[in-house]
Amino acid sequence: LDLDDAILEELDVVVASVHSGFRQEGEQLTMRLVRAIEHPHVDIIGHPTGRILGERAAYDVDIDRVIEAAVRCGTALEINASPWRLDLQDTLARRAAEAGVMLAVNTDAHDTGELASHMRFGVAVARRAWLGPGQVLNTKPLDDLLAWLARRR
């Protein structure tokens, strides 16, 4: 991770995402994600397949190993609601939820105007994946969300 543990432990929520090295071998990319999942300060893995619709295909990652690690460590996977990402896609979100992974819908908004406009796309992915409120982190009541965030700290 790019930040020291001393900084990460001060944050309310830590989302780790791959933002470089997309052309690495699948094993390397998979291990980067698994190591991030295993990190005690990481709560959510952002855009787990790295795809950008119409621009970049998902990177070569073993999503089943990523899901297994997320289950084992209690790390959530993101449904990135940006209309240019929609990552995780519905079928992978369903697979993750069936395995016991918590999902988090994130707008990936880069300005306040995108908050509401993007969220509907993420909700649509979650619905297509047949996710219930118990499987989506940011539908939880505040006390439950705070308990979930405190579980590994």
Model-identified regions with their sequence ranges:
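Charged catalytic cores and adjacent phosphate/nucleic-acid-binding surfaces used
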Residues: 1-153
